Amino acid sequence: MKKRTIAELLTDIRMAKYKIDMWISKAENRNKALERLSLSNIGRFPLLSKEYIKETELTRKYIVTLVQLKILLEILEIRLETLIILGNVVTYLSPLVEALNELKGQLGASIEFSPIIDEIIETIRTVYIAPNTVQQSPQINVKEEARQLLKEAEDVAKKELKENYKIEI
């Protein structure tokens, strides 16, 4: 794997956020279409209408996960920009990598997102975390901070979904 710079990684993160925005927009449009179909078919085809409602719920969950992923990428972007100034890589990025892995697992095997997120995670691990593990100073609980980051991303995602996408969770 080619060693990449933080600037290149930041560019990848920004592109991933843009793609996530596109997918959220597509999912929103699909959600609106399914809601219209559900309402128009409720009298004639109640079973079909129920299936549309179920798919609407699945699409909403997908949007929630995408917004959380976008927020985690924004946090990663901020941390990488801060890292340029600060310098201690392992302590700063390990919890975010763990949180991205967990959220990627929730998202499933997406053809569109998995390769992008895998590449970002792999770059962070091989280029920034692995070479610096020997000089890791303070011991931190990576899993706990990852859970905290996921909780923070979930809270921000709920707020953003309510304000921008009119989705209540």
From Swiss-Prot:
The keyword Cell cycle applies. Part of a cell division machinery. May fulfill a coordination function between the Cdv proteins during cell division. The gene is cdvB3. Disruption phenotype: Deletion mutant forms extremely small colonies on selective plates. Forms enlarged cells, with a highly elevated content of DNA. Mutant shows aberrant cellular localization of CdvA. InterPro entries: Cdv_Coordination_Protein. It comes from the Archaea. One of its GO terms (biological process) is cell division. This is Cell division protein B3. It comes from Sulfolobus acidocaldarius (strain ATCC 33909 / DSM 639 / JCM 8929 / NBRC 15157 / NCIMB 11770). The keyword Cell cycle applies. Keywords: Cell cycle, Cell division.
